[in-house]
């Protein structure tokens, strides 16, 4: 599927952050000088290696960066903490933590549900505090959009907008860098048709089978290799506009530009 480059360029200049934090000086200096450092990704299946943007993002980084994708299928902020996955992530002692949840927090299952206005925000604040306590830099990322269309546009009633707004609110109040992937991906998908967007669908993801009861239905949540590459690049090319010291560590992107997308 050929993608309209003009949309990428437009997105590259879209304001997406509410606050660009500075962070601990040694961490910033290491990134600017391309010394070895670690980025840890935490989140749900839309970040995870099997069907998320994480691998595509990690592939954009220079060899001095160790990118560790610890996102887990089916997890929410609540279950990620409750099951001990968050403590394992902290044990990595990363310099940067990219944190994206929402897809499972919105589900009614009490094992994963976290209310957008209350517990979801409390869980994000805990994660931000924990990362800062060990002198790391947290970056909050809103959820990747689903690819279900209504009347030729991405479905505005997917329930993720409330969680994106909640993440933005936490970022503003905690003075944390916020990357609005939900807004970016929704805007990009608005320029495609359902048929074109289905070109990113993954076949056979375990979460999709569990939810749909069959692997035959389209999986418009998880990503195939093309989707991983595209949306991973979207994250990389835009986060360097907010954490500008990361620019030298992303292949093909001038520091702070956020304008280079695959053609």
Regions found by a protein language model. Name each.
Residues 4-17:
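Bacterial N-terminal signal peptides
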């Amino acid at each position: 599927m050929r993608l309209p480059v003009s949309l990428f360029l437009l997105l590259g200049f879209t304001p997406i952050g509410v606050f660009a934090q500075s962070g601990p000086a040694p961490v910033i200096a290491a990134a600017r000088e391309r010394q070895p450092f670690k980025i840890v990704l935490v989140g749900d299946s839309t970040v995870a290696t099997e069907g998320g943007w994480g691998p595509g993002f990690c592939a954009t980084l220079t060899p001095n960066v160790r990118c560790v994708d610890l996102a887990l299928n089916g997890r929410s902020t609540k279950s990620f903490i409750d099951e001990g996955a968050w403590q394992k992530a902290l044990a990595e002692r990363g310099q940067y933590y990219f944190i994206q949840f929402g897809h499972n927090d919105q589900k009614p299952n009490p094992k994963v549900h976290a209310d957008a206005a209350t517990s979801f925000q409390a869980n994000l604040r805990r994660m931000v505090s924990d990362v800062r306590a060990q002198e790391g830099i947290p970056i909050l990322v809103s959820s990747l959009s689903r690819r279900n269309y209504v009347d030729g546009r991405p479905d505005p009633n997917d329930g993720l907008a409330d969680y994106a707004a909640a993440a933005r609110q936490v970022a503003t109040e905690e003075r944390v860098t916020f990357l609005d992937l939900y807004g970016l991906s929704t805007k990009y998908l608005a320029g495609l048709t359902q048929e074109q967007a289905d070109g990113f669908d993954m076949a056979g993801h375990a979460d999709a089978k569990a939810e749909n009861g069959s692997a035959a239905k389209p999986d418009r949540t998880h990503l195939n290799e093309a989707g991983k590459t595209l949306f991973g690049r979207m994250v990389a090319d835009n986060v360097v506009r907010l954490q500008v010291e990361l620019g030298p560590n992303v292949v093909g992107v001038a520091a702070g530009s956020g304008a280079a997308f695959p053609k």
